[in-house]
């Protein structure tokens, strides 16, 4: 790995560190109860907000990848960071709105959060693989590592981030605002450090999207891996939603 890309790799991984918090927030029982109380809905209704994340991801997937190839990893990552900031800060604003449209605001922001997820995936996965080109599998494992660390630390952070409003509601807005501001900082930083694909474009060595597609070959093993990834992720999300909606049900 070229050492000049080391700060860039750290910035990309930090996006997924905050993502580890963002994608897990709505699955935390205490946050779910706090949001439900503020919006005047049943706790189970928060499941629909979680599902909106998946909806947003599905909406963006068809064009996020081609845009990443055409516009570059930097732009794709920046779109993801900015969208995630909107999602997280939007959740805080939705909490403040309470029963005056708070639930609707949160649903729209969750869709934007899902779109952010798609752009981060299509920007950062190839970017870190291009940076750590001698060991791309290690590069992608690093993404999972940062997500796992964030999810492990989240329960401890919740104890620090909790506050109470004047109306007596439990609030986790400091966490929402903090993560949203972190994404704004990362949005700025991603433009300040070099990325391999941007350098290749500048030197005229970057292969075009059409040329890249011409050399694409899906082996039996690659198709099997795609199917495994889809079914494993889908099963995990399904079980998570069931657990969120029925936390006291024995398994």
Task: Briefly describe each language-model feature range.
Residues 82-99:
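C-terminal ends and interior cores of transmembrane alpha-helices
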């Amino acid at each position: 790995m070229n050492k000049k890309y080391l700060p860039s790799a750290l910035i990309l991984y930090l996006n997924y560190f905050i993502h580890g918090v963002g994608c897990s927030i709505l699955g935390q029982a205490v946050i779910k109860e706090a949001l439900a109380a503020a919006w005047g809905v049943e706790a189970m209704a928060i499941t629909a907000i979680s599902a909106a994340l998946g909806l947003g991801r599905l909406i963006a997937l068809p064009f996020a990848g081609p845009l990443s190839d055409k516009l570059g990893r930097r732009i794709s990552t920046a779109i993801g960071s900015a969208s995630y900031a909107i999602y997280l800060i939007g959740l805080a604003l939705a909490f403040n709105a309470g029963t005056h449209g708070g639930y609707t605001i949160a649903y729209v922001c969750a869709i934007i959060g899902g779109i952010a997820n798609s752009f981060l995936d299509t920007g950062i996965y190839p970017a870190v693989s291009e940076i750590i080109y001698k060991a791309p599998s290690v590069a992608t494992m690093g993404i999972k590592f940062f997500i796992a660390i964030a999810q492990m630390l989240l329960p401890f952070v919740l104890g620090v981030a909790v506050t109470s409003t004047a109306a007596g509601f439990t609030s986790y807005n400091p966490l929402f605002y903090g993560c949203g501001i972190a994404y704004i900082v990362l949005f700025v930083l991603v433009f300040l450090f070099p990325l391999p694909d941007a350098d290749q474009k500048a030197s005229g060595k970057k292969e075009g999207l059409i040329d890249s597609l011409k050399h694409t070959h899906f082996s039996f093993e690659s198709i099997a891996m795609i199917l495994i990834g889809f079914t494993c992720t889908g099963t995990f999300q399904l079980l998570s939603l069931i657990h969120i909606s029925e936390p006291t049900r024995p398994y």
